[in-house]
Amino acid sequence: MRNSFKYVAPDSIRAASEYLSTEKNFFFLGGGTDLLPQIKWGLKQPSLLVDLGKIESLKGMTAREEGFFIGAMETLGNLVKNPEANRYVPVLSQSAFCVASPQIRNRATLVGNILQERRCFYVNQSEYWRQSVVPCFKLGGEVCHQSPRSQTCRAPYYSDTAPVLLALDAQVEQYDKGTFELTAVQDMIRSHIHGRGEKFFLTGVFIPYPRQGTWARFIRQGVRGAMDFASLNAAVRYTPPVNGSGPVIRIFVGASSPEPVELRETADFMIANLSRLLDLKEEVKERAVKELIKKSVLVRETAISVRAKKSSFYLVANVLEELIAAMQLKVQVSWAGLSP
């Protein structure tokens, strides 16, 4: 199928934002590593592409007074190499390093990684292949081939950076009608996944600075170390109590559901038993795996079976064991763990 669309490249945020009110069937183009293959496969058929590459104000990373800001057109490759990013948000740089290959990271943007399309064995195929099945929810139909009784699409969300951003309470900066607004990353992801095709003009990502003593880690497992999407990824953050503020534990797991899964019950149990975590270590690990099994939505994937996927859940138990050990030893690792 031959794709035909108009192409524009505005040089300002205001000029680009005007298309939100004047066009309906269009897409903003960042790195293009997710969008362009979908256009090629006929999954997206825009009448207009708005390239954001000429807008200089969308580039750059800045250490602001209350947090670290990453422009919407900053690539994952730059996020990996940038000294300030590795100083202020090294766990995010680590997760960016795990995405795909160097060639893709040099094009793909952080915002694009957040707003990537969910993938499914029955959707991400050639147009000729898709003609052999009834259109599913993602293609305008009324069925999910992964689970015919499901009332919603069950395609997994594979972003490697999203669990980290969620664990760090990050926000996205959105431009709309002449104003900049901050929205929680979690709310934006849900609007993107469960919305009705609304367009967002995101200008960057803001990560608040953590309290002193914060510890965080990112883990990932894939069939191959590069190129493949994760079979499972997770981000864990612990912030100790300081000056009357209570402790914070965030546990988010990706690639196991249509959106990242928060293990809130496990985190609450850990906070309620901070002084006994070493003795309760095995129970914590067991609770985490059980909660993940309960909240996950596992489906058939191209490179891994449901059974193999479920066996990878032990990775979450491993990183929680690492966290408990660090807490007991009072190890003040670089707050966001290891940088690449």
Where are these regions (language model features)?
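C-terminal structural segment of proteins
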Residues: 1-340
